[in-house]
């Protein structure tokens, strides 16, 4: 009988090689010891190329070095054999007993299986979604939300101390456009007809907010609307200058009442956003207001620091940041000639604020259209004497919806978009969360609505959840306490399918760490699909409630462990694990 099963075989084997290097006086080489999973089972369960890394500094043949290092594994109780292959690969073969006992370790660990201390408590802030509160969240925001929430969960499982943050863009021009759009619809309800700018916000939600204001205040905010279009050239044209003119006039006409309209639409949209995300299973520790950076003087302070460092210059009355010195294609304005700070200026202040809060690393999750923004933000960090390497950017490509094989059109300003809420109502939260992370975040995602709604094995989320439900059904038929399976004798798990399933369970903790290290929660989704596939094959070819008690309990322990891993993985992705389907 071998000792209690090692939860992390790779760490165990890494320690063996690290000790071997120390004994040989080679610790100073500080080499990365990595174990890979061979593509062919005939090459073992783990393979290491350390001998080839040592060949040059030791001036020896890799195979000779590998032969020497292989002797260090003789004391491991988890290895059946060690082979040297090719130019000097060290291939390790786990004992059948080590694999068999792993299902018991999974059951003992429960919901903590797959968690590790890799992050060692490192403080990481993950900022994601951060959509302008100018309308309902749409399906593009949904992908960023699903990715960000899943990544934060994965990082936490890997031992990092994670803070989830939403940056509220409540100080920008887009909020003024929404306030203007709502006021114009409000005027219509008061019998004041006017040309509605084609580049204002067109959605029905704007009319809904106007109705709420009208219901509460009737005609209180009808202030000389006939003057709204005064001195606004081409007010009916689709030009930004015309829109700015209307906003300026609205502020003058409404006076202090403009703040009410502005704050009302902000609070309405922000409240809707919070509720929408909560229903999507996405929550935040901090909601950070952009306006607070202006109110506290943070934006002015950040610009002042850049000016002190000689990173700004004046041109045409505006202040420019020398971002081209940091790899940007051109310099960027931080303060316009009229004294107003740009969005870039508040973004600099926001990142300065982030690092002042003591995070070891900051992860920004942006839409892929912000790719060009990376160099200027990192440049500003460097100019402020902050380490730009501690700021990491994960880009998320837009999700394109397809219904009946046809692309669904999207335009936020024109009010032509599918909201995240509508998507959830159509396909369900589980399907949406899972489909959003099926691919790497920076890859385009075609979201097939018909597939997401189907109850077939072609639907990946259904396929994975059905595997979980099948295990629940087997255990329910058994009728005993699953807790007793923790002590089951698993030596009867000798079939090829069983050993393959056990190896798949062994791979789960490594998959979680890889997903955390590479910012790739899609690795969890891939893993779950593969695990479900192996389980379904095993289920279709195996009887579980057999008369022989040892075999029965061993198989039940195995599938119970599969259920636990499916549950744990789905939880990281924000997807439920139903007991019945």
Curated annotation (Swiss-Prot):
GO terms for MF: arginine-tRNA ligase activity; ATP binding
Chief site of localization: cytoplasm
Family membership: Belongs to the class-I aminoacyl-tRNA synthetase family.
Gene Ontology biological process: arginyl-tRNA aminoacylation
Localization per Swiss-Prot or TrEMBL: Cytoplasm
Top-level taxon: Bacteria
Matches recorded under SMART domains: Arg_tRNA_synt_N, DALR_1
This protein's UniProt keywords: Aminoacyl-tRNA synthetase, ATP-binding, Cytoplasm, Ligase, Nucleotide-binding, Protein biosynthesis
EC top class, as a word: ligase
InterPro entries per UniProt: aa-tRNA-synth_I_CS, Arg-tRNA-ligase, Arg-tRNA-synth_N, Arg-tRNA-synth_N_sf, ArgRS_core, DALR_anticod-bd, Rossmann-like_a/b/a_fold, tRNAsynth_Ia_anticodon-bd
Subunit description: Monomer.
Protein name: Arginine--tRNA ligase
Record field: catalytic activity: tRNA(Arg) + L-arginine + ATP = L-arginyl-tRNA(Arg) + AMP + diphosphate
Listed EC numbers: 6.1.1.19
Lineage, broadest ranks: Bacteria, Pseudomonadati, Pseudomonadota, Betaproteobacteria, Nitrosomonadales
SUPFAM superfamilies on file: Anticodon-binding domain of a subclass of class I aminoacyl-tRNA synthetases (SSF47323), Arginyl-tRNA synthetase (ArgRS), N-terminal 'additional' domain (SSF55190), Nucleotidylyl transferase (SSF52374)
Motif ('HIGH' region): 131-141
GO CC aspect terms: cytoplasm
Keyword Zinc: no
Species this protein is from: Nitrosospira multiformis (strain ATCC 25196 / NCIMB 11849 / C 71)
């Amino acid at each position: 009988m071998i000792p209690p099963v090692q939860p992390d075989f790779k760490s165990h084997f890494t320690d063996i090689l690290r000790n071997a290097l120390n004994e040989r006086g080679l610790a100073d080489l500080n080499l990365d010891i990595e174990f890979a999973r061979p593509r062919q089972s005939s090459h073992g369960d783990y393979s290491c190329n350390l001998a080839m890394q040592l060949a040059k500094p030791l001036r020896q043949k890799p195979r000779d070095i590998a032969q020497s290092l292989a002797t260090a594994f003789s004391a491991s109780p988890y290895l059946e054999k060690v082979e040297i292959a090719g130019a000097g690969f060290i291939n390790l073969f786990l004992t059948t007993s080590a694999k068999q006992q792993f299902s018991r370790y999974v059951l003992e660990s429960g919901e903590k299986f797959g968690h590790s201390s890799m992050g060692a408590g490192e403080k990481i802030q993950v900022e994601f979604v951060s959509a302008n509160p100018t309308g309902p969240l749409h399906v593009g925001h949904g992908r960023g939300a699903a990715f960000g929430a899943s990544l934060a969960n994965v990082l936490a499982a890997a031992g990092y101390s994670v803070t989830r943050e939403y940056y509220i863009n409540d100080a920008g021009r887009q909020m003024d456009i929404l306030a203007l759009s709502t006021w114009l619809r409000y005027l219509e309800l008061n019998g004041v007809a006017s040309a509605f700018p084609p580049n204002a916000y067109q959605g029905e939600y704007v009319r809904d907010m106007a109705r709420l204001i009208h219901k509460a205040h009737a005609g209180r905010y009808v202030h000389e609307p006939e003057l709204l279009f005064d001195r606004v050239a081409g007010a009916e044209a689709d030009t930004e200058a015309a829109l700015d003119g209307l906003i300026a006039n609205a502020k003058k006409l409404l006076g202090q009442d403009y703040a009410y309209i502005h704050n009302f639409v902000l609070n309405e949209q922000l409240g809707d956003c919070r509720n929408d995300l909560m229903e999507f299973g996405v929550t935040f520790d901090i909601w950070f207001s952009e306006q607070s950076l202006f109110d506290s003087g943070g934006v002015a302070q950040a610009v002042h620091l850049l000016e002190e460092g000689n990173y700004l210059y004046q041109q045409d009355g505006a202040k420019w940041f020398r971002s081209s010195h940091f790899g940007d294609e051109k310099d960027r304005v931080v303060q316009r000639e009229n004294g107003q700070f740009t969005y870039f200026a508040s973004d600099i202040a926001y990142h300065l604020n982030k690092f002042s809060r003591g995070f070891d690393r900051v992860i920004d999750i942006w839409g892929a259209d912000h790719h060009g923004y990376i160099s200027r933000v990192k440049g500003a960090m460097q100019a402020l004497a902050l380490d730009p390497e501690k700021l990491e950017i994960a880009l998320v490509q837009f999700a394109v919806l397809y219904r009946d094989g046809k692309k669904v059109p999207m335009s936020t300003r024109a009010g032509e978009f599918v909201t995240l809420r509508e998507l959830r109502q159509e396909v369900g939260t589980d399907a949406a969360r899972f489909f959003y992370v099926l691919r790497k975040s920076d890859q385009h995602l075609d979201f097939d609505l018909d597939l997401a709604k189907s109850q077939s094995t072609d639907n990946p989320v259904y396929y994975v959840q059905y595997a979980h439900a099948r295990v629940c059904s087997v255990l329910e038929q058994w009728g005993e306490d699953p807790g007793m399976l923790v002590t089951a004798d698993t030596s009867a798990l000798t079939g090829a399918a069983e050993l393959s399933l056990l190896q798949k369970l062994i791979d789960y903790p490594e998959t979680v760490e890889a997903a955390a290290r590479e910012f790739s929660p899609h690795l969890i989704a891939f893993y779950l699909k593969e695990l479900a596939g192996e389980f379904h094959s095993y289920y279709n070819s195996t009887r579980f409630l057999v008369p022989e008690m040892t075999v029965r309990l061993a198989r039940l322990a195995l599938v119970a462990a599969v259920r636990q891993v499916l549950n744990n993985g789905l939880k990281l992705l924000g997807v439920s694990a139903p007991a019945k389907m």
